[in-house]
């Protein structure tokens, strides 16, 4: 199942909306993270910078084989060998990763999914105790150049509430990622 309203513009247009390294830094994805799971690689906008940062592997998933192929070519161009690609529907089938196996989960521009709690619960399941989830989404403003329609676009407070309902604990306030996005960082409390 594809995420509603998730059509992608041309790669250059998409990439112009983000400063990936700055966003990853603000969301706490550092070299202290070993393994990362990314829910939806898209063009690899965040996959490639994440792979350059972490000491382990970025496990990236997407339902669209074109997105997987595009990101794979980009990884090859930069000679990145620490990315594991998986084509599949992680919403209905999960990631296929063992529970508690990654340090960080990336949910970027995907939380408007029809079942955000299921998506967040799968991210929670994947994380080690003490691991973090980074959420990035379009701000709740109809003038943004892209993003899902306003009737399905979550406000930051709604995304935060869903994450708390899924079991996460906030690590920070809502993070401004101008000009078009906001971010959240939450953790799976150690048990």
PLM features: residue spans?
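A short acidic, Gly/Pro-enriched loop at the edge of an enzyme's catalytic core
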Residues: 95-104
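A short SAM/SAH-binding and catalytic strip from SAM-dependent methyltransferases
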Residues: 103-116
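Class I SAM-dependent methyltransferase Rossmann-like catalytic core
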Residues: 1-18
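Conserved class I S-adenosyl-L-methionine
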Residues: 134-158
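Conserved alpha-helix/loop element of class I SAM-dependent methyltransferases that forms part
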Residues: 15-34
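Class I SAM-dependent methyltransferase SAM/SAH-binding core
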Residues: 37, 43-93
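Core SAM-dependent methyltransferase catalytic element
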Residues: 175-191
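A short glycine-rich, Lys/Arg-flanked "PGG" loop and its adjoining helix->strand segment in the class I
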Residues: 118-132
């Amino acid at each position: 199942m594809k995420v509603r309203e998730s059509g992608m513009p041309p790669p250059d247009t998409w990439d112009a909306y983000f400063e990936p390294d700055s966003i990853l830094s603000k969301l706490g994805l550092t070299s202290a993270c070993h393994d990362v799971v990314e829910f939806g690689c898209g063009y690899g906008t965040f996959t490639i910078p994440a792979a350059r940062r972490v000491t382990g592997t970025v496990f990236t998933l997407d339902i669209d084989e074109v997105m997987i192929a595009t990101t794979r070519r980009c990884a090859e161009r930069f000679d990145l060998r620490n990315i594991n690609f998986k084509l599949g529907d992680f919403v209905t089938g999960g990631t296929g990763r063992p529970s508690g196996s990654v340090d960080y989960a990336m949910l970027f521009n995907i939380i408007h999914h029809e079942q955000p709690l299921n998506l967040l619960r799968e991210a929670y399941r994947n994380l080690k105790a003490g691991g973090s989830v980074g959420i990035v989404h379009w701000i709740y403003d109809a003038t943004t150049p892209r993003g899902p329609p306003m009737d399905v676009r979550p406000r930051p407070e709604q995304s935060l509430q869903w994450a708390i309902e899924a079991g996460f604990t906030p690590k920070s306030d809502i993070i401004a990622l101008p000009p078009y996005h906001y971010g959240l960082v939450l953790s799976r409390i150690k048990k």
